[in-house]
Amino acid sequence: MSPHPPAQSRTQSRTQAAPFAIANVRRVGIVGRYNTPGIAQPLKRLAAFLVGRGIDVLVEADTSSLIRLRSYPAATIDELGTLADLVIVVGGDGTMLSVSRQLAMHGIPLIGINQGRLGFLTDIGLAEMETALAAVFDGRLTVEDRMLLRADVIRGDQTVTSSLAFNDVVVNRGGFGGMVDLSVAIGSSYVCDLRCDGVIIATPTGSTAYSMSAHGPIVHPSVRAWSLVPISPHALTNRPIVVGDSERVTITVTRAREAAIHWDGQTQQGLVEGDCVVIEAAPCSVRLVHPEGYDYYAMLRKKLHWSESPLSMDRSSRRTESRTPRNKQERKSDGQKAA
């Protein structure tokens, strides 16, 4: 008997997030990318803003310890999941991915403040942090639920690893230089054999990440589907396909000297020949809160520099580079200023 229930029954059993009311938020958790130079001051600004709104503040334990935000109670990520009504993440998309996965089962809404580079998920800039958050707490906001994937590694008749992914699940050749042979099935249908560097299974959120670099489609977050994108396939006719989220994708490693699976590029597991990776929609989702007026297409246009001439894009890139510390001494100086 298969260790997994039919895909349809799993889809029907997904939890439905309760309606979110900002007026009910009494306690907010703060998580920061604490190893980033200069992040201490924005975190202190954020905490002061929340206290000024009459909101209790909890600071994630590692953030509290390393940034010395000891004026506020500290809590682990799991504790934030049970104690906080809302969590604000200050960092880049990588930080947001990690926090989202850890809090997904708790159903805690998240707001992202961008202290990184692109900021697809952390869409509020530091310069407008207080203004944007004031609008949110005044009720001028947009809420959206983003899907997650769950990927299980089956070896023989045992599930050896299971984890969630917000962006993507990647099965690839690991550290070995040769290709890997994979067999792909969707539901009960055999699809194809692939000889390639790997394959990306991307959520709509992840469609603007690794998948886009591998020529996968950009999928709007409201579309209940994910993309299956081959990485450098040997046969040029192997193309990306979009799969409905009620399906189950099974990828079997049929031949490989070395192979691995990666969840959001942050956790991984080695694979051997015969291993099956079973991917399906997770029973939980990530709830993102944006200021009113958030526009996905405007975000794409801004982040991906659509409608800009090549010359203006080059100038923008040069300005970004000029603001980036170019050596250890400059980074050290930034850290001293932040302290």
Model-derived features: positions:
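A residue-level signal for conserved active-site and pocket-lining positions in enzyme catalytic cores
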Residues: 33, 88, 92, 114, ...
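Short glycine-rich anion-binding loops that position phosphate/pyrophosphate groups of nucleotides
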Residues: 35, 93-95, 118, 205-207
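Short glycine/serine/threonine-rich phosphate/pyrophosphate-binding segments
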Residues: 39-40, 94-100, 208-213
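Gly/Ser-rich helix-loop-strand patches that form or flank binding pockets
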Residues: 103-113, 120
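ATP/nucleoside-binding phosphotransfer catalytic cores, i.e., glycine-rich phosphate-binding loops
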Residues: 171, 187-190, 236-339
